């Protein structure tokens, strides 16, 4: 189990790109995910309790409760949302720092209920590629290749991120989005 979220600190961006290209893409995504049975479980420890701002005992109690829910019951309870999403065309999200509209028409919704991840629970789909317009701001920190990004804002026109900013590391964020022609699109 991890003890830090900075385990890759000091590794060059070039080496991280090679790792993602030759290990993550080829070994993990192409071989392991597609050809083996797997389930991801992040065992509760001090690191995860700190990240959750909880004591270790409180975090363990919370974690085991969400891991031991009735996933078959969840699967059934998700069906009305899946049906609604499958007949929905336009989605409009409005929140502080966000006004985003897109289509999910004819993109099938999928239910996730403990088959590959524990804990789990979501009904997911994605936008029609060129339908995303507006902007979204993320109010939580995120990490990519050991770089922390905070207050990310993406502005979209016809599905493409045309402007990307962050509190810090905006230049790096845009370099990541410029890695290939699909990186500025959702889906």
Predicted regions located by residue number:
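Generic secondary-structure boundary/loop-capping signal
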Residues: 115, 133, 141, 170-174, ...
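Dual-mode signal for accessory low-complexity, basic/Gly-rich regions
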Residues: 163-187
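Short, catalytically relevant binding-site loops at active-site mouths
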Residues: 108-109, 142-144, 169-170
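Short acidic-glycine loop/turn motifs at beta-strand connectors
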Residues: 96-97, 104-106, 156-160, 165
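General structural feature for long, well-ordered alpha-helical segments within catalytic domains
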Residues: 77-81, 132, 148, 152, ...
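Oxyanion-binding "anion nests"
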Residues: 122-164
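Active-site bordering "gate/hinge" segments
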Residues: 1-133
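Short, solvent-exposed amphipathic alpha-helical segments in soluble enzyme
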Residues: 108-109, 152-155, 178-180
């Amino acid at each position: 189990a991890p003890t830090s979220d900075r385990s890759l600190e000091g590794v060059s961006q070039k080496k991280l790109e090679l790792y993602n290209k030759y290990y993550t893409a080829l070994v993990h995504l192409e071989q392991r995910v597609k050809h083996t049975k797997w389930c991801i479980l992040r065992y509760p420890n001090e690191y995860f309790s700190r990240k959750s701002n909880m004591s270790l005992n409180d975090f363990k109690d919370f974690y085991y409760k969400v891991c031991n829910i009735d996933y078959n019951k969840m699967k059934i309870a998700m069906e009305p949302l899946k049906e609604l999403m499958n007949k929905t065309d336009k989605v409009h999200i409005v929140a502080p720092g966000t006004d985003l509209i897109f289509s999910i028409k004819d993109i099938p919704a999928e239910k996730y209920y403990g088959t590959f991840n524990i804990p789990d629970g979501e009904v997911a789909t994605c936008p029609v590629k060129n339908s995303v317009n507006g902007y979204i701001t993320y109010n939580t920190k995120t990490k990519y290749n050991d770089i922390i990004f905070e207050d990310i804002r993406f502005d979209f026109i016809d599905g493409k991120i045309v402007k990307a900013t962050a509190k810090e590391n905006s230049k790096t964020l845009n370099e990541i989005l410029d890695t290939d022609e699909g990186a500025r699109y959702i889906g």
